[in-house]
Amino acid sequence: MDASDGRIGLAAYSASKGGVVGMTLPLARDPARNGIRNMTIAPGIFGTPMLFTMPQEVQDALAASVPFPSRLGTPADYAKLVHQIITNEMLNGEVIRLDGAIRLAPK
């Protein structure tokens, strides 16, 4: 999310994420003749060990901020997308946001 929704004070972090996004298509094209594909998944707000250290009210507010579905992402959500990427060979050189349509505020 920070590659496209950069936040105040996080310019270097956003730039690093933007670098990954910028490499996605060239990294798909270069080895394509060998049948190698490249995709980037840009996850939104997921339930992670770091997030679970936050107070419950913060976790609830983050989950509620996701337009649909209004919840935190799960490992199963991520795994379903990975499975689709693996099984659909037409997916190549793309960045897929897995974020429930959330966009971060500047702060």
Residue ranges and their predicted role:
Residues 45-47, 51, 103:
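Conserved sequence/active-site signature of Rossmann-fold short-chain dehydrogenase/reductase
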Residues 1-4, 68, 101:
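Active-site pre-Tyr helix/loop in NAD(P)-dependent dehydrogenases
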Residues 74-98, 103:
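C-terminal substrate-recognition "lid" of short-chain dehydrogenase/reductases
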Residues 57-77:
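Catalytic Tyr-x(3-8)-Lys segment
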Residues 1-19, 24-33, 45:
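Catalytic loop of short-chain dehydrogenase/reductase
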Residues 21, 31-47, 91-98:
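Conserved Rossmann-fold SDR core element
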Residues 8-9, 33-35, 65, 89:
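Short coil/turn segments at alpha/beta junctions that flank glycine-rich nucleotide-binding fingerprints
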Residues 7-8, 51-53:
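Conserved catalytic-core motifs of eukaryotic protein kinase domains, centered on the activation segment
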